[in-house]
Amino acid sequence: MIQVAAGIIIAFVITYFLLPLIIKIADDNQLYDLPDERKLHKHEVSSLGGIAIFTGLVLSVLLVSDFNNFNAEFQYFIAAFFIIFILGLIDDIFFLKAWKKVLGQLLVTAMLTFKAGLLITDLHGFAGIHSLSYTESIYVSFFTIILLINSFNLIDGVDGLAGSIGFISCLLFGTFFFMNHVLTYAVLAFAVCGALLAFLKYNFPPAKIFMGDSGSTLIGLMCSILAIKFIENPAIQSNFFNEATPAIAFGFLLVPLLDVLRVFALRIYKKQSPLAPDRNHLHHLLQNKGLSHLEVTVTLFLAQLMFAGLTLLVRNLDLHIILALQFTVYFSLVYILKEFIPVRKKLHIVRAETSESAIPELKVYPIFRAKEKASVRED
């Protein structure tokens, strides 16, 4: 208990006191994520919050972990955190092409699967499949990790959204690890909670700083590790969820996962690249209905809480029934949102005129040329 509490407190304190310093440095050096026609923010805001999240998380884990019982796989976890963070930070500052980001994510995933042994080895009866061969396990694990990394990256388009969803997901995973005395992963999960709680103080609308790709991809990576360890832990399965752990983990991450799967499916159906930017994400749909940043974040946070609660409520049902309920409720709500919820107010995009007397030109600093950005990152 002391170890877990220390993890939360240290991560919170380090992140909380680093953020004002990062905001000041960003302001002094004009390191901003500039608004454009697709982004939902209207003011210059730094996207370097991932630096504080990464520092608070990693230092917390290193300081409170018992190195006498330190899992060998954790050296690869720390290396993976560092690589995904640096990759995201480079993208936040200089912008990376999509293929370079995907290549980096594949490198991280290969390290976790081949070296750390982070594998889904059993589907617990999903589609009639139980044990997976090594090759099948590699494919399923790669898909899961890459999907979760990008799902958090792609929902990070509204102040407080990715942080609040990541917080509740890690809190749920951490609680069950703690209840089953899996302290290593409980510490990891609760350290994320501590860092995100501090970050949300500065990220809730109106945001003073964004987590950027360096933060959102790191949170996605953390959730992928926790989800796979949750699915693979025999104590959690036998004590709480029978054969339903994949559906439970899915329910804890349902909003980001189904959002990215739905949007990718829509793009493929329209014969577009899955990575082509659009405004079909849930936060875009809600904003198009006239909701503010805060209202969008609170709505989706409560939706994730509802799905987690529903999943736990029906945890003793068959795996397929739980998944069917999750999909049915989610897509029913999306349909109702699109077809029956009225628009509260019209959105008007003000575009600059060509005349010199028009709206004053927005400065574009060399380090952040928003118009030239080509990446998977969507707002």
Regions found by a protein language model. Name each.
Residues 1-25, 29-30, 54-82, 162-289, ...:
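Alpha-helical transmembrane segments
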Residues 30-31, 92, 122-132, 292, ...:
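Membrane interface segments of multi-pass transport proteins and intramembrane proteases
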Residues 34-47:
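Juxtamembrane helix-capping/reentrant segments at transmembrane boundaries
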Residues 59-72, 90-96, 113-127:
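Transmembrane alpha-helix boundary signature
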Residues 82-87, 104, 108-119, 140-150, ...:
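Membrane-embedded alpha-helical core segments of multi-pass
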Residues 132-143, 186, 244:
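Membrane-interfacial loop-to-helix junctions in multi-pass transporters
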